[in-house]
């Protein structure tokens, strides 16, 4: 059991080290590479265990955007019917 957690920790540490070294060179990235890296980090953030225990601010922002779009929907539909 401990070996499983240790292997996950080592994998996360190695991945973090690689990302940190990649971040240092981020000035040399083209927009496509930045988008791929952003998508990969977003995926890891959504699927990591800590996001279930401690929700991040980005999730609340997404929720507020959803609420704002739903509250604005009747106005848009009303304007479209005119």
Swiss-Prot record:
A single GO molecular function term of this UniProt record: hormone activity
GO cellular component assignments: extracellular region; synapse
UniProt cross-references to Pfam families, sorted A to Z: Pigment_DH
Residues modified as Alanine amide: 80
Keywords for the protein's UniProt record, in alphabetical order: Amidation, Cleavage on pair of basic residues, Hormone, Neurotransmitter, Secreted, Signal
Principal localisation: secreted
Protein name: Pigment-dispersing hormone peptides
Gene Ontology biological-process entries: chemical synaptic transmission; response to light stimulus
Biological function: The pigment-dispersing hormone causes the migration of the distal retinal pigment into the proximal end of the pigment chromatophore cells and thus decreases the amount of light entering the retinulas. May also function as a neurotransmitter and/or neuromodulator.
Tissue expression as described in the entry: Expressed strongly in the head and weakly in the ventral nerve cord. Not detected in the midgut cecum or hindgut. In the cephalic neural complex, specifically localized to cells within the optic lobe, anteromedian protocerebrum, accessory lobe, tritocerebrum, and subesophageal ganglion.
Keyword Disulfide bond attached: no
Signal sequence range: 1-26
Localisation per UniProt entry: Secreted
Family: Belongs to the arthropod PDH family.
